[in-house]
Amino acid sequence: MLKNRNLINADDFNVEEINEILNLAEEIIKSPSDFSNLCNGKILGTLFFEPSTRTRLSFESAIHRLGGDCIGFSESASSSTSKGESLADTIRTVSNYTDIIAMRNPKEGSAVLASSYAEVPLINAGDGGHQHPTQTLTDLLTIWMTKKKLDNMTIGLCGDLKFGRTVHSLIKAMSRYENNKFILISPEELQVPDYIKMFLKSKNIEFKEVEKMEDVIGELDVLYMTRVQKERFFNEADYVRLKDSYILDNDKMKLATEDLAVLHPLPRVNEIATEVDSDPRAVYFKQVRYGVIVRMALILKLLGVR
């Protein structure tokens, strides 16, 4: 049972529980009208201490599509924390207004702290550079709907693998399904952190690090592209030097298999050329829709409605 649970890290739920959410999401895709009033009278609180238009709108769309309502703020300046209120007091207060909370905060560990004070289910909508579990569920649903499986695949992750929290969460999640291996494509300065490599080694999961996408794209079942995130850099010169490191275009797509699935958590800058958008293997805009659907399923499960 997922009722009244929190979702802080991608590994908070076991594989069976994740599959339960994905199966419900697939039901919603097949018959959305059956779910349009299940959260009538329920209120979602969206507490976004860090701007994120897509994630916030996705949560808001999800609760509205379920017949519920939404209250919250989109930046810390709009909250009482700008007046000096502690995160603990904010969470305690909002728990009295809402039935469920989605929170994004730039400080790592803030979601764990918030969950200890929340009196309603709390969803981590992004926690510094550490975890982004609902994006992981979105990615899993996208792969499932596209490939019809979550195991026995070669998954390439490309771009900013150091600061990209979606990458870290996805690697850990896909590692729980059998016989997946990873190809990590990045410049040396943006390689995946050591703790992720140690995690993969501890699980005896095959992975390799490469610098050239074109050398490995033909081996991939899934290619997960990421942008180089300016906001994670302390030095603008480093950002400018690395931001165009990896661009996926039609020439590189010609080297890929016919059933490759290209994902991207968005927003895109220029790491995927717009000419790729019309390629049927590009599923990153479908991924946006799946993000709303999987958040609908998650809300239903945590509220115990389904």
UniProtKB/Swiss-Prot annotation:
Give GO BP annotations, semicolon-separated.
'de novo' pyrimidine nucleobase biosynthetic process; 'de novo' UMP biosynthetic process; amino acid metabolic process
Q: Which UniProt keywords apply?
A: Pyrimidine biosynthesis, Transferase
Keyword Transferase included in the entry's annotation: yes
Q: Give the protein's function.
A: Catalyzes the condensation of carbamoyl phosphate and aspartate to form carbamoyl aspartate and inorganic phosphate, the committed step in the de novo pyrimidine nucleotide biosynthesis pathway.
PANTHER family for the chain: ASPARTATE CARBAMOYLTRANSFERASE, ORNITHINE CARBAMOYLTRANSFERASE, MITOCHONDRIAL
Extract the HAMAP family matched here. Answer: Asp_carb_tr (MF_00001)
Protein's recorded name: Aspartate carbamoyltransferase catalytic subunit
- This chain is encoded by the gene named pyrB
